[in-house]
């Protein structure tokens, strides 16, 4: 497996990945997703040869805050260290940044994954998070 920057947006490949994990809010707005990729700070992909296994996308200013927007791995390739490798690459790249944040599904699986990678819930540091969602 190789982690490298994802520089050439392949819409069918990306939509297939997002659909495979049930993230239809993104696939329902493919133009917004395309623009999101284009404007991301860093997009990484995990490949085995030319086969896409997973992807990560970060946004932010790269100095005071980085937000891990997406980490997705095709279901048949999950639990093989791919998500960990993508996230570890982000953490290494932005080790100088004070705040690296993310939002995730509220499931035991995802919570355990991010805790294993050194993340804590906002409530542990006296904070909470808010979100306003729309797709226009």
What are these regions (language model features)?
Residues 84, 100, 106-126:
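Conserved active-site alpha-helix within GNAT-family acetyltransferase domains
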Residues 73, 79-91:
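Conserved acetyl-CoA-binding loop-helix of GNAT-fold acetyltransferases
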Residues 6, 74, 105:
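Residue-level recognition of the GNAT/N-acetyltransferase active site
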Residues 45, 51-60, 64-72:
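Conserved beta-strand in the GNAT
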Residues 22-43:
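Active-site rim helix/loop that mediates acceptor-substrate recognition in acyltransferases
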Residues 1-28, 125:
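Short amphipathic alpha-helix that is part of the acyltransferase structural core
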Residues 69, 76-78, 93, 111-113:
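Acidic/histidine-enriched, beta-strand-rich ligand/metal-binding domains
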Residues 2, 98-100:
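Short active-site oxyanion
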């Amino acid at each position: 497996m190789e982690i490298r920057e994802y520089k050439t947006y392949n819409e069918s490949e990306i939509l297939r990945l997002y659909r495979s994990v049930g993230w239809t809010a993104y696939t329902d707005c493919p133009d917004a997703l395309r623009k999101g990729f284009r404007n991301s700070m860093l997009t990484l992909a995990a490949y085995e040869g030319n086969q896409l296994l997973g992807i990560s996308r970060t946004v932010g200013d790269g100095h005071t805050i980085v937000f891990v927007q997406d980490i997705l791995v095709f279901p048949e390739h999950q639990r093989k260290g791919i998500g960990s490798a993508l996230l570890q690459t982000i953490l290494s790249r932005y080790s100088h940044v004070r705040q690296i944040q993310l939002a995730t599904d509220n499931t035991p699986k995802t919570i355990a994954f991010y805790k294993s990678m050194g993340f804590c819930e906002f409530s542990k540091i006296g904070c909470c998070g808010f979100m306003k969602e729309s797709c226009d």
